[in-house]
């Protein structure tokens, strides 16, 4: 899986360090290795896109290192591969030594894992499961402005799964903790790998059951019910949050625009 890049190699280049991505001219590099001065670098093939290899190179470039968020407008499959590269690079960087015996680790030749040749321990990338849920009440959807997003964007509620919790229990707990309401009729919609830093978003839709909105001020600046045709600033297209909102709007239109 790991080899030295040669002059004739070409493809998509995920050059990553400390959760950053090399984006010359603001774009994901695509082309010949020589064009980007990558010949001789150790690389890992992490997939293919449109017939070309996708290579991961763990390297810090002096300029043009940016966030993977800057390539969110790429096709979903390529964005997913870019996210995979950033997450794998961070995994390899943060697991250089075995947590049990302290000896150096080396990558597996057959899977995304690191191995300890001293105590035989095996490590895999840690993925944090999260829930994200759109809640509908009649012709309205619950949207909130998060403390960490002070740019006016309103979105649906989300949170991390705790140890020993089912996804359904997480939805009920997170919604109650952040907004003070109860939900019913929970339906799974989709999932999305989310490399910020190493999450897997599991998306749901639900209906309002009971309770008044009482926000957790440590998490939210405000939350309210918004009619489907009068919405505030929303998350960008390509995010699972935006899909949930648009799906809820579509259902409201079907019910209220006869």
Swiss-Prot record:
InterPro entries: NAD-cap_RNA_hydrolase_NudC, NudC-like_C, NUDIX_hydrolase-like_dom_sf, NUDIX_hydrolase_CS, NUDIX_hydrolase_dom, RNA_Hydrolase_NudC, Znr_NADH_PPase. Its EC number is 3.6.1.-, 3.6.1.22. Divalent metal cations. Mg(2+) or Mn(2+). It holds the Pfam family NUDIX. Belongs to the Nudix hydrolase family. NudC subfamily. GO terms for biological process: NAD catabolic process; NADH metabolic process; NADP catabolic process. A motif (Nudix box) lies at residues 159-180. Its cofactor is Mg(2+); Mn(2+); Zn(2+). It comes from the Bacteria. Homodimer. The keyword Glycoprotein does not apply. This is NAD-capped RNA hydrolase NudC. One of its GO terms (molecular function) is magnesium ion binding. Substrate binds at residues 69, 111, 124, 192-199, 241. A divalent metal cation 1 binds at residues 158, 178, 219. A divalent metal cation 3 binds at residues 174, 178, 219. The keyword Hydrolase applies. Residues 125-248 form the Nudix hydrolase domain. GO terms for cellular component: cytosol. Zn(2+) binds at residues 98, 101, 116, 119. Keywords: Hydrolase, Magnesium, Manganese, Metal-binding, NAD, Zinc. It catalyses: a 5'-end NAD(+)-phospho-ribonucleoside in mRNA + H2O = a 5'-end phospho-adenosine-phospho-ribonucleoside in mRNA + beta-nicotinamide D-ribonucleotide + 2 H(+); NAD(+) + H2O = beta-nicotinamide D-ribonucleotide + AMP + 2 H(+); NADH + H2O = reduced beta-nicotinamide D-ribonucleotide + AMP + 2 H(+). mRNA decapping enzyme that specifically removes the nicotinamide adenine dinucleotide (NAD) cap from a subset of mRNAs by hydrolyzing the diphosphate linkage to produce nicotinamide mononucleotide (NMN) and 5' monophosphate mRNA. The NAD-cap is present at the 5'-end of some mRNAs and stabilizes RNA against 5'-processing. Has preference for mRNAs with a 5'-end purine. Catalyzes the hydrolysis of a broad range of dinucleotide pyrophosphates.
